[in-house]
């Protein structure tokens, strides 16, 4: 009790009248937990916990449940929670997932052939992409990590956009400045992806805080993996969002592996979701990331809360990364084929939605084959065309840095051009747009 009294005194030490009142109460009555609690509440020093004279070490008592409504056979357990999309909408969702899967397979092999420098697949996480994206508005802002390609596709980012970026040609929206998989598009409100892990989380909070100050009825969603939640920026972002009450949706893709580190070595306790309610006072939901309808419902609710209540929401989507971390990784070195197949066959998000469609008579094997064939043709034709294009102009190295080029930037540009003129045979200048015009005397 004495330590509690001193703590309260330290908080009110600059207010002599309040301090006098507290000491009077303390001297006249027993300094029981109820007296201290009553005084704090009366003087607006309330804290959201009870005082007690029972010495007890707290431990984890319960785990946040994982919300799911559709099993692997495509059966919805609670029909009233089925989003009831139309046949056309469900087919669009399914074909987008299937197309993403086909594109990932082709571009992974293309990287192995040396035609692009890098690639990351989304095998096993397709329901997270489409389910969450379908629940958002186009006016919402997206900060992604690097495994959310399906989200962008749903919002209108085309296969050509994706492949042009991977080939870094002159049609790349990023003007060839980023490595593959680092997409960005003002048109679909996608902030450009950056490589450093978790930097997008504090940025997303800043974005949503700006939306709040502007009185917008939108939110910002930020995607990240459970490995990113081990970074310091995760805490900074969560704390800022909670303290400032920003309309931010924190969407964690818990796919069990942070490159080669399993989730059991990333954290203890109740995973990522467990940090939300007690750690940051944040509304939190855990969801089956391979159930597209559960993901949709959860994201829809999270958006409603974020926009209407102007508070952040944490979502932890439980899934599994079926593919390698990237083309720079060989996951056979740290996990078994049996583990991969157990998820690939037992909790496959694509086949789960296919089964749902089968029950309704909306899909056939012929449609499946046609969709896969069309996707392969589209991806291959896009790739062939992208490889024929020029690389961005050499001058693009210096654009978009400042509104108007600074003297030192102009000098650097001049020095580069002079260097290229001096050693033209050392560089593949014929691959770059406008190179002849730029290097002309």
Curated annotation (Swiss-Prot):
Amino acids binding K(+): 194, 199-200
- Needs which cofactor? thiamine diphosphate
- Read off the CDD domains from this record: TPP_E1_PDC_ADC_BCADC
Kindly list the places in or outside the cell where this protein is found, as annotated in its UniProt entry: Mitochondrion matrix
Q: What else is known?
A: Bound potassium ions stabilize the protein structure.
Q: Which family does it belong to?
A: Belongs to the BCKDHA family.
Q: What is this protein called?
A: 2-oxoisovalerate dehydrogenase subunit alpha, mitochondrial
> A single Gene Ontology molecular function, please?
metal ion binding
Q: What's the stated role of this polypeptide? A: The branched-chain alpha-keto dehydrogenase complex catalyzes the overall conversion of alpha-keto acids to acyl-CoA and CO(2). It contains multiple copies of three enzymatic components: branched-chain alpha-keto acid decarboxylase (E1), lipoamide acyltransferase (E2) and lipoamide dehydrogenase (E3).
Q: Which residues belong to the transit peptide? A: 1-17
Any one of the GO BP annotations: branched-chain amino acid catabolic process
GO cellular component term, pick one: mitochondrial matrix
Q: How does it assemble?
A: Heterotetramer of alpha and beta chains.
Q: What is its EC number?
A: 1.2.4.4
Q: Which organism encodes this protein?
A: Dictyostelium discoideum
Q: Which InterPro entries match?
A: Alpha-ketoacid_DH_E1_comp (IPR050771), DH_E1 (IPR001017), THDP-binding (IPR029061)
Reaction catalysed?
N(6)-[(R)-lipoyl]-L-lysyl-[protein] + 3-methyl-2-oxobutanoate + H(+) = N(6)-[(R)-S(8)-2-methylpropanoyldihydrolipoyl]-L-lysyl-[protein] + CO2
Q: Where does thiamine diphosphate bind?
A: 145-147
Ordered alphabetically, the record's keywords are: Metal-binding, Mitochondrion, Oxidoreductase, Potassium, Thiamine pyrophosphate, Transit peptide
């Amino acid at each position: 009790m004495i330590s509690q009294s001193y703590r309260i005194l330290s908080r009110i030490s600059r207010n002599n009248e309040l301090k006098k009142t507290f000491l009077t109460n303390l001297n006249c009555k027993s300094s029981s937990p109820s007296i201290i609690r009553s005084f704090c509440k009366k003087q607006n020093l309330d804290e959201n916990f009870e005082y007690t004279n029972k010495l007890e070490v707290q431990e984890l008592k319960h785990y946040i449940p994982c919300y799911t409504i559709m099993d692997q056979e495509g059966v919805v357990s609670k029909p009233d929670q089925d989003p009831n999309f139309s046949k056309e909408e469900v087919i669009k969702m399914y074909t987008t997932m299937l197309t993403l899967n086909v594109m990932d397979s082709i571009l992974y092999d293309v990287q192995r052939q040396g035609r692009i420098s890098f690639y990351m697949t989304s095998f096993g996480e397709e329901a997270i992409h489409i389910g969450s994206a379908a629940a958002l508005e186009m006016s919402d802002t997206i900060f992604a990590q690097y495994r959310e390609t399906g989200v962008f596709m749903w919002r209108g980012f085309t296969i050509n956009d994706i492949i042009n970026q991977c080939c870094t040609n002159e049609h790349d929206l990023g003007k060839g400045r980023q490595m593959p998989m680092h997409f960005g598009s003002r048109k679909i409100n996608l902030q450009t992806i950056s490589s450093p892990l978790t930097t997008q989380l504090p940025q997303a909070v800043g974005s949503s805080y700006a939306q709040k100050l502007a009185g917008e009825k939108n939110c910002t969603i930020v995607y990240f993996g459970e490995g990113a939640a081990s970074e310091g920026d995760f805490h900074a972002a969560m704390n800022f969002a909670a303290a400032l009450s920003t309309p931010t949706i924190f969407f964690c893709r818990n796919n069990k592996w942070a490159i080669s580190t399993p989730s059991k070595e990333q954290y203890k306790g109740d995973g990522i979701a467990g940090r939300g309610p007690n750690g940051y006072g944040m509304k939190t939901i855990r969801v089956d990331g391979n159930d597209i309808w559960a993901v949709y419902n959860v994201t829809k609710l999270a958006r409603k809360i974020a926009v209407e209540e102007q508070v952040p929401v944490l979502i932890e989507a439980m899934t599994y990364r079926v593919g390698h971390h990237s083309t720079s990784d060989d996951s056979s070195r740290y996990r078994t084929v049996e583990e991969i197949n157990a998820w690939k066959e037992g909790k496959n998000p694509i086949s789960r939605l296919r089964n749902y469609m089968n029950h309704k008579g909306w899909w056939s094997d012929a449609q499946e084959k046609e969709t896969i064939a069309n996707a392969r043709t589209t991806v291959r034709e896009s790739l062939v065309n992208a490889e024929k294009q020029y690389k961005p102009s050499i001058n693009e190295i210096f654009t978009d840095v400042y509104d108007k080029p600074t003297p030192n930037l102009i000098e650097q540009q001049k020095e580069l051009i002079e260097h290229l003129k001096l050693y033209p045979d050392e560089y593949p200048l014929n691959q770059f747009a406008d190179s002849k015009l730029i290097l002309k005397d």
